[in-house]
Design a protein with these regions (language model features):
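A short, N-terminal "cap"/entry segment at the start of jelly-roll beta-barrel domains
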Residues: 1-31, 114-153
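Ligand-binding loop in jelly-roll beta-barrel domains
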Residues: 86-113
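Short acidic-glycine-tyrosine-enriched beta hairpin
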Residues: 70-88
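Short hydrophobic/aromatic patches on the structural cores and recognition surfaces of FHA
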Residues: 63, 79, 93
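Conserved short histidine dyad/triad with adjacent acidic residue
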Residues: 18-22, 35-51, 86
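A generic structural motif
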Residues: 45, 55, 62-64, 71, ...
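Short, conserved beta-strand element in jelly-roll/cupin
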Residues: 36-40, 50-68, 106-110
Length: 153
């Protein structure tokens, strides 16, 4: 059992570049990961992405943001709950407001994942759980045939 008392965890910056910036307070878990997340005003979470193995969910604590999917955008506010099943539609959070957007993020982590990025045409194979796992990112357009490069094929 692990107990994290309110206000005792350390915040750490997540992946950042350009319009992408959020920070996270890891709460722990083995198969079910949990973390407090804060998305700064005018920023986006991660690029539009879809997990093929990991299921994610979030519960909005404060602030407002929009969730972007291939079907459009939906505004989110305190008390809203979202679930993103593995293999489900791509998603991204966008905070176009003036206040931080805070949420509890949950993920069923299995130590590996395949993640698609529709906007950039990339695909990532992830070994290990976020944030310490290794990522191998490729452009989908540069796919190779199964036997490419094999001298015996």
């Amino acid at each position: 059992m692990k107990i994290v008392k309110n206000g005792t965890g350390a915040w750490a910056d997540s992946l950042q570049r350009g319009k992408y910036h959020q920070r996270r307070q890891e709460l722990g878990g083995e198969k079910l990961k949990a973390g407090l997340w804060e998305l700064a005003p005018g920023k986006k979470s991660f690029p539009l992405h879809a997990h093929q193995v990991t299921e994610e969910a979030l519960y909005v604590l404060s602030g407002k943001a929009k969730v972007r999917t291939p079907e459009g955008t939906t505004e989110l506010g305190p008390g809203d709950y979202l679930s993103f099943p593995a293999g489900g539609p791509a998603h991204q959070l966008v905070n176009d407001g003036k206040e931080p957007f805070r949420y509890l993020g949950l993920s069923a982590a299995f130590g590996h994942d395949l993640v698609e990025y529709p906007d950039s045409g990339k695909i990532a194979f992830v070994l290990g759980a976020y944030p310490t796992g290794k990522r191998f990112i490729f452009e989908k357009a540069k796919q190779a045939d199964y036997f490419d490069g094999d001298p015996d094929a």
